[in-house]
Amino acid sequence: MEPDLQPIPESDEVMPWTIAFEDVARNADFDFNDAVIKLMPDPKKELCTVTVMAAGSKARMYLHYDGPDGDQNLGEIHELLGGKSTEFINTPMSIVSTPFVEVGSVKWPKGYNVATDAGRFYIEIQRGTCEECTDMITLADSPGKMPQALLVAGEWKWPKEGTHIFSTYHIFPYWAKDATKVNYWGWYGSPTSGNYVTY
């Protein structure tokens, strides 16, 4: 396999970043589309714009940001997209049908960078009607842990509903096994046709 030697963006560069969350605790299909958000950090303005893009779970999912002012609940993912938690939004078809929603901007102080601070965004999942029956979905905080969320530089085409990420991105399992190998850093550059959502 030829190495992908695309330049790796600086973590404080003004560019979009995508976080894709997967509820691995319950009914995991490993499509990494249960909640998809886009971040646009602007270090000069010390702000990060947050956009909600997709909801591929029928559980109630609350987007949180643990920033300089403490933990903020930014809203329920389906409701932010104008839908209900009983439906999939922008995951069943090959092209999005619901417009993305810019939630707003959160404080992003100097010293924050995506590589170390994207994990400040996480999903709280509420099970049924029990307000205390919740799980958290976060980016891995150390190597070797089962990924519950992926951080991708730039715009990302997430797998369609029920499509395993391995079927959409064939290099992904190699990257997941050893993310230090340059050969696999561009795993998200060549999705399998028909298996992903475009916009």
Please give the residue ranges for each predicted region:
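Extracellular distal adhesion/interaction modules in secreted or cell-surface proteins
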Residues: 1-199
